[in-house]
């Protein structure tokens, strides 16, 4: 799998997600100015920056099938990363025919996200929706919520 990426600053997150979904399939990341190896399976990820926003675009080709998506984003690196990873996850899971139990979350503790969202004043329904937006299954989202409730009691008792 060849992945063409015009934003080196999101390479780690993109590569981690692709490796989780593709398993043992070799992944080659190609940055601007590098030669592109021949491979029928490819992903092209581009971020076009404008004044106050960006347009994120993902084209995934796998086993002769092609999926494409575009979405606006702010210029914030974290939001760009989340937008790209969400589109990438949706395109690859559609092409592969399987999802991951924790969705597109890589290297992130879901309970930590739940804690942060709770502390930001979000309601449980909003938090669950946000987690499912990340591709987290409803069962895993509920597990994260339950775990946070248990941890919260312990932390507050300290």
Report the location of each language-model feature.
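A short, structured N-terminal alpha-helical element that caps or precedes a catalytic domain
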Residues: 1-94, 98-100
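Active-site catalytic microenvironments for nucleophilic, acid-base chemistry
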Residues: 91, 117-120
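N-terminal [4Fe-4S]-dependent radical SAM core
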Residues: 96-99, 119-120, 124-158
């Amino acid at each position: 799998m060849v992945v063409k990426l015009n934003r080196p600053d999101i390479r780690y997150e993109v590569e981690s997600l692709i490796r989780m979904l593709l398993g043992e399939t070799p992944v080659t990341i190609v940055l601007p100015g590098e030669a592109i190896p021949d491979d029928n399976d490819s992903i092209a990820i581009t971020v076009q920056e404008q004044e106050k926003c960006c347009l994120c675009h993902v084209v995934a080709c796998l086993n002769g099938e092609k999926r494409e998506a575009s979405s606006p984003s702010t210029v914030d690196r974290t939001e760009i990363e989340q937008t790209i990873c969400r589109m990438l996850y949706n395109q690859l899971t559609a092409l592969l025919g399987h999802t991951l139990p924790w969705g597109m979350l890589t290297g992130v503790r879901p309970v930590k996200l739940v804690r942060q969202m709770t502390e930001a004043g979000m309601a449980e329904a909003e938090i669950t929706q946000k987690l499912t937006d990340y591709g987290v299954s409803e069962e895993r989202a509920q597990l994260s919520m339950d775990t946070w409730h248990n941890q919260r009691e312990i932390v507050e008792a300290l």
